Design a protein with these regions (language model features):
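N-terminal cap/leader regions of alpha/beta-hydrolase-fold enzymes
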Residues: 1-242
Length: 242
């Protein structure tokens, strides 16, 4: 496996990205990995590191690049992370994801027709929003995406209000004890997807709260995380390799 930090052009600005690649030659499917509010920290890097062994190129773009490099891995810095999130906008986030997808499409070892996205927490929201706005994405996975029901950095629309435009199969993985998104939020999102006849699967994990996949958080639940990751790879295998 090859690992690098790369520079990605976003409208003339530089966004860092954590890139992992299989050792095998040829063109591979690729997955954009979207951070939690703490940036491309050790957890997000470890997720991206898992992809090459499954035959995928992985790329985790640093979405807070407009504010400079963020200290990585300090989960106690909630106020700092939330302040940065509050200064984000949906327009900038979509520009960043489009740039990450364009970067992958330009790589000689990536099949440009087989790119997916997975996101965690804030990144789950970004993943949902992205598959509603970027047709180049052929599969999406949302891990406990908060604030899907609200716009960010402007009057709207919220990601859930863009569900009619969702253009890729979507997998959602949620904790039954989570408050953001709550089970009621997840049900509302599912209702909207059903209303528009979209292809999706949602799984609710009993006894799990927010962040159950992240082994750096007290909310980590090993068995649920293991099962959710297996479902993630199976989803990508079906929709990016099938």
């Amino acid at each position: 496996m090859a690992v690098n930090w790369v520079d990605i052009n976003v409208d003339g600005e530089t966004m860092e990205g954590y890139l992992t690649q299989p050792a095998a030659s040829g063109r591979h499917p690729a997955v954009v990995v979207i951070q939690e509010i703490w940036g491309v920290n050790s957890h997000i890097q470890s997720v991206t590191d898992r992809l090459p062994s499954q035959g995928y190129v992985g790329l985790a773009p640093a979405l807070f690049h407009r504010e400079g490099r963020m200290t990585l891995g300090l989960y106690e810095e909630m106020d700092t992370a939330l302040a940065r999130l509050g200064r984000c906008s949906d327009a900038n986030i979509l520009a960043d994801v489009r740039a990450a997808v364009a970067y992958l499409k330009a790589q000689p070892n990536v099949d440009p027709q087989r790119i997916g996205i997975v996101g965690f927490c804030f990144g789950g929201r970004v993943s949902y929003q992205s598959v509603c706005n970027i047709p180049d994405l052929k599969a999406g996975v949302v891990f406990y995406g908060g604030r899907i029901l609200q716009p960010l950095g402007g009057p709207g629309p919220a990601p859930v209000e863009q569900s009619a435009a969702l253009s890729a199969p979507l997998l959602g993985l949620f904790g039954e004890e989570d408050g953001n998104p709550s089970p009621a939020d997840v049900a509302r999102i599912a209702d909207e997807l059903n209303r528009h006849h979209k292809t999706y699967e949602f799984h609710m994990y009993p006894g799990c709260g927010h962040g159950f996949h992240c082994d750096g958080r007290a909310s980590y639940r090993h068995e649920a995380a293991k099962d959710a990751w297996a479902k993630t790879i199976a989803w990508f295998n079906t929709h990016l390799k099938g």
